[in-house]
Amino acid sequence: MGGLTLHPMKEIRVIVSGEHRAFVTELLDKVHASGYTVIGNISGKGHHGLHEAHFMFSEQESQVMIMAVVPADKVEPILAGLRPLFERYSGVMFVSDVAVSRQEYFGKQTAGS
């Protein structure tokens, strides 16, 4: 029985106000990301100061983090799609190298990527 094979991919983490959650998830759908995870009501401190979670209020009033694992060739279209949002509103995107064992769950990279 052989071991698992790992395949290089990119992990995207986008932190935005909850009111922009749909913008980000629709963009991920548009670029054919195979899926994403949303973590709501997050707290933290950044360029615009301290952001506190609002567990008792609307999720649109708090920060959310949307995470996805995609082939490297999808990073630039995601960044391009987020550019108009980040020009008007606060938010941040992190990109990390990751390795996945089930590449078929995340989409394959195209040749040359």
Region annotations inferred by a language model:
Residues 1-113:
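Positively charged, small/polar-rich N-terminal and surface patches that mediate targeting and assembly
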